[in-house]
Amino acid sequence: MKDLLKFLKQQHKSEEFDNIRIGLASPDMIRSWSFGEVKKPETINYRTFKPERDGLFCARIFGPVKDYECLCGKYKRLKHRGVICEKCGVEVTLTKVRRERMGHIELASPVAHIWFLKSLPSRIGLMLDMTLRDIERVLYFESYVVAEPGMTTLERSQLLSEEEYLDALEEHGDEFEAKMGAEAVFELLKALDVDADVAAMREELPSINSETRRKKITKRLKLLESFQLSGNKPEWMILTVLPVLPPDLRPLVPLDGGRFATSDLNDLYRRVINRNNRLKRLLDLAAPDIIVRNEKRMLQEAVDALLDNGRRGRAITGSNKRPLKSLADMIKGKQGRFRQNLLGKRVDYSGRSVITVGPTLRLHQCGLPKKMALELFKPFIYGKLEGRGLATTIKAAKKLVEREDPEVWDVLDEVIREHPVLLNRAPTLHRLGIQAFEPTLIEGKAIQLHPLVCAAYNADFDGDQMAVHVPLTIEAQLEARALMMSTNNILSPANGEPIIVPSQDVVMGLYYMTRDRVNGLGEGMMFTSPDEAEKAYRTGNAELHARVKVRITEYDVAEDGSKTEKVTLTDTTVGRAILSLVLPKGLPFELINQAMGKKMISRLLNACYRTLGLKDTVIAADQIMYTGFHYAMIAGASVGIDDMVIPDAKKDIIEGAEAEVREIQEQFQSGLVTAGERYNKVIDIWSNANEKVAKAMMENLSIETVKNRDGEMEDQASFNSVFMMADSGARGSAAQIRQLAGMRGLMAKPDGSIIETPITANFREGLNVLQYFISTHGARKGLADTALKTANSGYLTRRLVDVAQDLVINNEDCGTFEGVKMTPLIEGGDVVEPLRERVLGRTVAEDVLKPGTNEILVERNVLLDEALVDMLESNSVDQIQVRSVITCENDFGVCAKCYGRDLARGHMVGHGEAVGVIAAQSIGEPGTQLTMRTFHIGGAASRASAENSVQVKTTGTLKLQNAKFVRNTDDKVVIVSRSTEITIIDDQGREKERYKVPYGAILTTDDNATVTSGEVVANWDPHSHPIVTERQAKISFADIDDSNTEMQQDELTGLTRIVVNDLSKANAKEPKLILESDEHGLQEIRLPSFTTIEATDGMQAKPGDVLARIPQESSKTRDITGGLPRVADLFEARKPKEPAILAEVSGTIGWGKETKGKKRLVITPKDADAYEEMIPKWRQLNVFEGENVEKGEVIADGPESPHDILRLRGISAVSNYIVNEVQEVYRLQGVKINDKHIEVVIRQMLRKCMITYAGDSNFLEGEQVEVSNVKIANRELEKQGKIPAQYETQLLGITKASLSTESFISAASFQETTRVLTEAAVQGKEDELRGLKENVIVGRLIPAGTGFAYHQKRTARKLAERQAVEELSVSAADAEQALTEALNAEVMDTPSSDE
């Protein structure tokens, strides 16, 4: 029977569980796991190497050392399986049971579990409502604690020192009970009545007023309730039995020379056992109290060290002064169980080697060295050799392969055919870092890689290595071929643009062959077809660049795939005609009838993919690459020093700039400008000079003048190699050429501030020593940045993956009507991202109407593809409401409609797509790229000169958005609001440009005026912020005296002005201007530090007059150094140091009573109580008394805090803010990421909410819960007609969000393992295994991708089983009832016997 049970037990498949529960182990449970008590500290006998009986490696407890053999050797072999040897007591079985059988130690005295004691907040402390220090004093035998006060005046859980205890004993005798050590805490915990406490606290909560007490009680209530629900008992936090880990998980290995290598755990266990045995002996001997106490304390310390060494006091060290690795250390950190063995495993059948170029490969191929292939495909080769009859056994096959017989190679060819291999390059930053290829066998020892996939791998051939993996099973091969093949990964998942794009030499070749040249050989010829043009080129009758006419045949591809011909005589060049021969039919010739730079080639491949599909694109990409390589060779473009032409104008520009700088310097010395202004202006002058030199140089390089056929002079694009390389996008940029042939310009110090002496030389002229020395700053900073930021970026990616890993596409449509509003993104007047790019591949949330009409252009829930976007653009739609993952209403995962297009495939996203991980990779991957690319411009300061005007680029109508303005004495408009924008509207009513104009800007035209291109419409001073009067008023000074201001004379004009001193010094009064006007009464304006006062005391001010100017700070350069940490700050939702102050309510601004160092801001709404806020005096406010503000408007400048935006402006505002800020950082680096990915992460950051009103739900006020849980609970409550809970969404940083996920397995494997597991155990948490990480850890298919269907089937099967069981139980109940009725009837019928 036992064997049968065993057999059944083995049959049970391990993955058939639905969730994992973690809890506290009760002593009985620990004993039930155990196979015997470990009584001795001995490990193995050093002579025989056999484990000692009852020791830490005892074979009787843990199982045999050799398979099916008992320790003394009486029973050997399989036939005795299951026998227990009567001599040595060992069960005859497999030795691997030594990995799973546990033992236990019966502790002579209870011991507190350090995790529940010291892991903050201390669970034991919270349970007993005592402080951690008090509990520690009891545990480590410094104080007594009252366990049972009896009829005395003492309180339960009161602490008594030794003297107090003796006094109490004298006074009360044995009426009370006080103890020390873990027994005392054990008794206290055991005496707790959890149910009664919970009920009492629930009643008490509503009546509590103090916030701190309420918080504390809520915390304790949550803890007690979790004990109530989980079935854990509080006293189980104190150990009375200690489990012992199976011996094979803490091995002891004999080294040669009689020494042993052992796991640290064995040392820790030995200490525990030694101290425990000593304590038992002392107790038996009834030793004096003080000795026993000391021994108990040592036992407590030994168990602490075993569970978590170093958590309390000094870590216990081994013989080599290194802290011992405890159980907690085994599971946490990069080398711990989770990250080392469960999430990352080494794989079989893999190899690695250096990579080289394979320019002749097709896109789906890679070159695999024969040696590697032979090794990797061994099992397949053995099988084939046996199947062919070339070898009789595996051994013979092995011999054949080792001898490398000729037939082995034939078999290898056959095995490899159609069997894809995976190539991976570390670091794998996104999913394109592992792709599948078909191997072709090559001689040599280096793997050959197709040049076009280098971009995806970020690989180059300067010694990079790659790993090869072999997918073994049919399913794996199928997935490799269908999903991972390089030919299936043409589009980048980050932005949906082709990632298989030619670069470098290929671009150079294509650019060279598609350029035109004036008066080239063969100009003006006519050809009947591109083939004829090619013949003319091959025979030397025409050159590549000759301008000719060619008859071009184009094919229009219809929807059904049929092609119609169209023939036109086109002006083109010979080279372009030749290029048209390699393109697939169906692409318009105009795509290549131009000089093909990198952007154009990318556009060409994109068009090809969208119109002709995958297969043609792959073929085209290969053909384009071969052609490019060929013509790059023919071009033979090389760079000589004479190619870097220095412009003649450079000398004059630099002299002019130096003169301007001298002038500024003189003004500074005569006190006209402050040091900061001088610095800013000098830097502006040099930035402008640099731009001018660069412009002159590029004009010089890019155009040359030649004679045409008629003997006239004509301009044409230059054939200078340096220019061609940069212009085509093959290598280098204008910024780099500027350093070669213009001037190096301004350099930055390592701290980011700009050195004001520029490097006027360039690399062709050479730098002198000082210039070279200044340059080294930037170069070194670049290298240092690289090293640091690679790690930072990797960590950011890890956090992103962790927070987003469980977001999977779950269903088709969640049915929401919500969405986000999309408008074109405008920065600095330019449209940086047109609407079409932002909405492409999104689903429309509500019908899109034609502007000004009710005509529906696109209905809701339609996916916008290229054609629809073009249609919307031609109808000049300027805003669209689209579905977004942020507003998706699925409880778990997101729906396909809210996500939209799968960027890497170009169609609607499929079910089971792991959009979270893709998003994390798309954001993280360029982060690493950026950090590796800081230093290419060698730290040259790339700071735009400060803007001081708005110059319009297009002709149209000027409109002011949310403007407040006054007219000054010259009848010009002066802006007096913070959020004014100028927009330029064209004749179709489309917004063409948008500019922010600052407070105090003066407009040259009026609202709704017509402006022409190039006109300057607004001016302001970029270096200072003016204070402008809005009405006629009399000015008087208040608190302006020598203590806080000083006079400064302007030597040019002889005027004196008052400048405010630094007010951050102690008790400085704040100077004010008082404005007195008839209709508005008094208004005061406070002046911050360093303000220059332009008004005079007692003057009559007109509207638009400038009363004072506040200087602006000088600017630092923006390197991505600001970039990566900035992105991390945004995703971590960190509060900035001095955040902008936002208005908490809408209303009128006023001032209240001041206190030390702070002013009191009062906002009075129309119909509610005034809101007050204290603001530090030194903060510069944007608002004046009497102004009206809207809720969420900026009152004091500074970086905005996302938490404030969420609280005051809502979810859509905060998501817009984060998306735009993150995008700005990436855009600065020229990286494109789709907004979707950032939204996915934001959705995860907004998962939690704070309960503001509990209603009839089980939540507590102030508790933090998952939004989805509240929604589910509220739906239930509404069904029952009860009051739902109300909540406020909270924004969590990605680290916090990952740690507070529902799944404790996922959180524990991320960070802070101890804390997460402690919390989960106390709450008796269940992990539903919803996310990807949890499933990887328990060793199942993940519920995404191809595993999605498996999991769905499993759930369906479980449901069916459950229903079947219910039906069965119902029918069983029916049967039972019928039976009882039948029996009763019989009883009634049987005649009674007494008759």
Curated annotation (Swiss-Prot):
Catalytic activity as recorded in UniProt: RNA(n) + a ribonucleoside 5'-triphosphate = RNA(n+1) + diphosphate
UniProt KW keywords: DNA-directed RNA polymerase, Magnesium, Metal-binding, Nucleotidyltransferase, Transcription, Transferase, Zinc
The keyword Magnesium appears for this protein: yes
Annotated Gene3D superfamilies: 1.10.132.30, 1.10.150.390, 1.10.1790.20, 1.10.40.90, 2.40.40.20, 2.40.50.100, RNA polymerase II, clamp domain (4.10.860.120), RNA polymerase Rpb1, domain 3 (1.10.274.100)
Pfam families on file: RNA_pol_Rpb1_1, RNA_pol_Rpb1_2, RNA_pol_Rpb1_3, RNA_pol_Rpb1_4, RNA_pol_Rpb1_5
MF-aspect GO terms: DNA binding; DNA-directed RNA polymerase activity; magnesium ion binding; zinc ion binding
Residues the entry annotates as binding Mg(2+): 460, 462, 464
Amino-acid positions noted as binding Zn(2+) 2 in the UniProt annotation, renumbered to this chain: 814, 888, 895, 898
Any single Gene Ontology cellular-component annotation: DNA-directed RNA polymerase complex
Domain of life the protein comes from: Bacteria
Record EC number: 2.7.7.6
Annotated cofactor note: Binds 1 Mg(2+) ion per subunit.
Binding site for Zn(2+) 1: 70, 72, 85, 88
Annotated InterPro entries: DNA-dir_RpoC_beta_prime, DNA-dir_RpoC_beta_prime_bact, RNA_pol_asu, RNA_pol_N, RNA_pol_Rpb1_1, RNA_pol_Rpb1_3, RNA_pol_Rpb1_3_sf, RNA_pol_Rpb1_4
Task of the protein: DNA-dependent RNA polymerase catalyzes the transcription of DNA into RNA using the four ribonucleoside triphosphates as substrates.
Complex and partners: The RNAP catalytic core consists of 2 alpha, 1 beta, 1 beta' and 1 omega subunit. When a sigma factor is associated with the core the holoenzyme is formed, which can initiate transcription.
Similarity comment text for this entry: Belongs to the RNA polymerase beta' chain family.
PANTHER family from the UniProt entry: DNA-DIRECTED RNA POLYMERASE, DNA-DIRECTED RNA POLYMERASE SUBUNIT BETA
Protein name per Swiss-Prot or TrEMBL: DNA-directed RNA polymerase subunit beta'
Species of provenance: Pseudoalteromonas atlantica (strain T6c / ATCC BAA-1087)
Gene from which this protein is expressed: rpoC
